[in-house]
Curated annotation (Swiss-Prot):
Alphabetized NCBIfam families for the sequence: 16S rRNA (cytosine(1402)-N(4))-methyltransferase RsmH (TIGR00006)
Name the UniProt record assigns to this protein: Ribosomal RNA small subunit methyltransferase H
Family label: Belongs to the methyltransferase superfamily. RsmH family.
Binding annotation for S-adenosyl-L-methionine: S35, G36, H37, D55, F84, D105, Q112
Source organism of this protein record: Streptococcus pyogenes serotype M49 (strain NZ131)
Amino acid sequence: MTKEFHHVTVLLHETVDMLDIKPDGIYVDATLGGSGHSAYLLSKLGEEGHLYCFDQDQKAIDNAQVTLKSYIDKGQVTFIKDNFRHLKARLTALGVDEIDGILYDLGVSSPQLDERERGFSYKQDAPLDMRMDRQSLLTAYEVVNTYPFNDLVKIFFKYGEDKFSKQIARKIEQARAIKPIEATTELAELIKAAKPAKELKKKGHPAKQIFQAIRIEVNDELGAADESIQDAMELLALDGRISVITFHSLEDRLTKQLFKEASTVDVPKGLPLIPEDMKPKFELVSRKPILPSHSELTANKRAHSAKLRVAKKIRK
């Protein structure tokens, strides 16, 4: 791993091992990031196996081309620079219409958080950006400075689950009427100023939830995850598995709901026989989410909110 792209992989063994890797299988890492999951997965593949890696951040791909070089030389890896919401179309274009397993590590990777100029962090002074794909048009600056008051309230409440969403949106509206809000620290101070003193004494940074909300809006994270996970579940071969790591309640709720819909059947109680085409196509590999071990939590504080859910395809 290059120094510029240092990333500690969360739930490394659990995420990959739960895919029940076949040496000659076709797999997808939908969120390449620091390439930790990819490297471990590739170590389990034989010469006939192949891994397709998606990331919309060119730096992640550049880093992986160094760290995964031995597998690249053997022709076992294909990198695809794109949002994972286009996963099905991109794989189909490469002649891949069925996969044996796929993993997602949702959210922002550590290098993106740590790279000051990306504007993801409320702890470092930087321009308001928050784009995972540097070529996309919508930035945090546009959201903060051009979205109407009601839209800001909606985003803050829906994606940040912040009970002071109205007060924060009002404070932003007042500030930007005087001059544009340009920096992360400037926004963080406005958020703090909008909250009552007793709220500021609580654990955690007061701007965390609002920064999360803006980041989700800029990158359409939930919409992309919803589309991509559903497409991935369609692409899975019989006995294929999907692993999804989430870091906040919105992602986890989405994943849990998609897995629940695919693994349960909605028919009247007492029906003697369930028609074959109505039987669930998936089963949950683990009923409850898998959490990081105590040792992992000690070694990596960013793992504390991680949850892993895994499902297996049992019918085509």
